[in-house]
Amino acid sequence: MKGGASGGTLASMIEAVKAAKNDVRLRKEMGNPYILCPEKKDLSHRQVSVRGPVFDQDFQSWSGPFIMEAINARVVLRSHMLSGMPYGNNFLYREQMITGKGFKGRLSALTLSTMLGLFAVGVFMTPTRKILQRFLPKPGEGPSPEAQAAGYFDISLLGKTASGEKLDVQVTGDRDPGYGCTAKMLAQSGLSLAFDFDEADREGGFWTPATLMGDKLINRLIDHAGMTFDLK
């Protein structure tokens, strides 16, 4: 993966941390992986996130935390709920950054984990947060068009059943994941909503892309957004 962060994204993260620091209820909600599933009250199976360097046996590689898991996992869990719990009440989902094998991979995972941890602590504490804000990009600043065009992402999705069966999907994008590709995803999502559905196809509500648009959106992303989805 190759991409950058904008000042607006960082400012949003900082404001969320500031709000949670002063609100116990908000902190609990932000720490609840099922916060987007209020319609189903019996979801209590513990989700396990990668917090530090971990050697992943499936990929035979070291890995560290992925900063977007806190958002992505909650959307996936809501999709699962809206789909009728097809994977069962014990469904687990997590994301992590693969850093490679051997000593170099372990060191990269440790560095990644340490930097994210220090950033989180720095943002949480007022004095260090003010210092960080002097050096971080400001809202409106971010990756240049050239940097976005040079970016990319490569995601490995591995599904495992209770009986041990595995399903592997590779997803790639040809632009910066946070901006170049995200802009195309948003555009194709809007076009899908406008042209791929009759009004009677879906009721209103708090849907996710997977449960509302599904394969129709995937086809658009393949045809018009420079993305690939490869089932292995």
Question: What would you call each of these model-derived segments?
Answer:
Residues 1-232:
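C-terminal catalytic/substrate-binding lobe primarily of soluble NAD(P)-dependent oxidoreductases
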